Every structure is written in structure tokens, then in C-alpha cells.
């Protein structure tokens, strides 16, 4: 267990050194005002904030990837032999076949609105 805690501590130190070096090299050319502001920021120690953000973004990415993978896997499990799927496929096919076959039987019908019989249309 001590090797795991040492590994964790070592990993944290490595990340911290990398980010401190990056951030220090990033702000080489500064003015006096920027240096004064940087002294205030250095006093607040934001190094752990970057590590925290990396962990949170990593966890969020892991959750999103897990949701996408589970969705893809569930879509693959949907087979065409599924009874519900077959019912829908056959139902739509039969509906369209019956509509095509019954085209000769369809007749034009006129519906009259009896309530509107009192209104006269202008010529």
C-alpha cells in the first residue's frame, strides 16, 4: 500500500513540476504591473486548481464516453428477429399493401356541412 501512496505522491509531484515549469516559462516577458499582479496570484497558489480541473474534465469525458459506448452497444443488440420489431415492420408493410390494393375501391365522396347551409356564396 505504501508503494501506491508513494506512486500517487510521485505522480502529483511530477504533474505539479510540469505545470509550474510551464506556467513560469509562459510569463517571461512581463511589465512591472504584471509582475505585481503575478505576485498576488502566486500568493494564492492556483497550482492545485489546474490539477482539479484536469481531474474533473477527465471524469466528465469518461462519463460521456461510457454513455456513448452503452448507447452503441444497446443499438447493436436490437435484432430484426425481435417480435416487437417484426410487428412494426409487418404492420407497415401490410398497411401499404392494403392501401395499394384497395385503390380501385376508393370512390370520391362529397361531405356537406349542414350547419353552413344558411350561408350563401357570392357569385
UniProtKB/Swiss-Prot annotation:
Effect of residue 54 to T: In LQT6; forms I(KR) channels that deactivate twice as fast as wild type
Molecular function terms, GO-annotated: potassium channel regulator activity; transmembrane transporter binding; voltage-gated potassium channel activity involved in ventricular cardiac muscle cell action potential repolarization
Keyword rRNA-binding set for record: no
Membrane-crossing segments per the record: 49-69
Bilayer topology term: Single-pass type I membrane protein; Single-pass membrane protein
Expression (tissue specificity): Highly expressed in brain, heart, skeletal muscle, pancreas, placenta, kidney, colon and thymus. A small but significant expression is found in liver, ovary, testis, prostate, small intestine and leukocytes. Very low expression, nearly undetectable, in lung and spleen.
InterPro entries assigned: K_chnl_KCNE (IPR000369), K_chnl_volt-dep_bsu_KCNE2 (IPR005425)
Variant or mutagenesis effect after changing residue 20 to N: In LQT6; uncertain significance
Single Gene Ontology BP annotation: membrane repolarization during ventricular cardiac muscle cell action potential
GO cellular component: apical plasma membrane; cell surface; lysosome; plasma membrane; voltage-gated potassium channel complex
Intracellular or extracellular location(s): Cell membrane; Apical cell membrane
UniProt-annotated glycosylation sites, renumbered to this chain: 6, 29
Cytoplasmic compartment segments: 70-123
Pfam family, one: ISK_Channel
Keywords: Atrial fibrillation, Cell membrane, Disease variant, Glycoprotein, Ion channel, Ion transport, Long QT syndrome, Membrane, Potassium, Potassium channel, Potassium transport, Transmembrane, Transmembrane helix, Transport, Voltage-gated channel
Keyword Endoplasmic reticulum attributed: no
Effect seen on changing residue 27 to H: In LQT6; uncertain significance
Disease annotated for this entry: Long QT syndrome 6: A heart disorder characterized by a prolonged QT interval on the ECG and polymorphic ventricular arrhythmias. They cause syncope and sudden death in response to exercise or emotional stress, and can present with a sentinel event of sudden cardiac death in infancy. Atrial fibrillation, familial, 4: A familial form of atrial fibrillation, a common sustained cardiac rhythm disturbance. Atrial fibrillation is characterized by disorganized atrial electrical activity and ineffective atrial contraction promoting blood stasis in the atria and reduces ventricular filling. It can result in palpitations, syncope, thromboembolic stroke, and congestive heart failure.
Subunit structure: Interacts with KCNB1. Associates with KCNH2/ERG1. May associate with KCNQ2 and KCNQ3. Associates with HCN1 and probably HCN2. Heteromultimer with KCNC2. Interacts with KCNC2. Interacts with KCNQ1; forms a heterooligomer complex that targets to the membrane raft and leading to currents with an apparently instantaneous activation, a rapid deactivation process and a linear current-voltage relationship and decreases the amplitude of the outward current.
Its job: Ancillary protein that functions as a regulatory subunit of the voltage-gated potassium (Kv) channel complex composed of pore-forming and potassium-conducting alpha subunits and of regulatory beta subunits. KCNE2 beta subunit modulates the gating kinetics and enhances stability of the channel complex. Alters the gating of the delayed rectifier Kv channel containing KCNB1 alpha subunit. Associates with KCNH2/HERG alpha subunit Kv channel to form the rapidly activating component of the delayed rectifying potassium current (IKr) in heart.
Family: Belongs to the potassium channel KCNE family.
Identification of the protein by name: Potassium voltage-gated channel subfamily E member 2
Organism of this sequence: Homo sapiens (Human)
Gene transcribed to yield this protein: KCNE2
Amino acid at each position: 500500500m505504501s508503494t501506491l501512496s508513494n506512486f500517487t505522491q510521485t505522480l502529483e509531484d511530477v504533474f505539479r513540476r510540469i505545470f509550474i515549469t510551464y506556467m513560469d516559462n509562459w510569463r517571461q516577458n512581463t511589465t512591472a504591473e504584471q509582475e505585481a499582479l503575478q505576485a498576488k496570484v502566486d500568493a494564492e497558489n492556483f497550482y492545485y486548481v489546474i490539477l482539479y480541473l484536469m481531474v474533473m474534465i477527465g471524469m466528465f469525458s469518461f462519463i460521456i464516453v461510457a454513455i456513448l459506448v452503452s448507447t452503441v452497444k444497446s443499438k447493436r443488440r436490437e435484432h430484426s428477429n425481435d417480435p416487437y420489431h417484426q410487428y412494426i415492420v409487418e404492420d407497415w408493410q401490410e398497411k401499404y399493401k392494403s392501401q395499394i390494393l384497395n385503390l380501385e375501391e376508393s370512390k370520391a365522396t362529397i361531405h356537406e356541412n349542414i350547419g353552413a347551409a344558411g350561408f350563401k356564396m357570392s357569385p
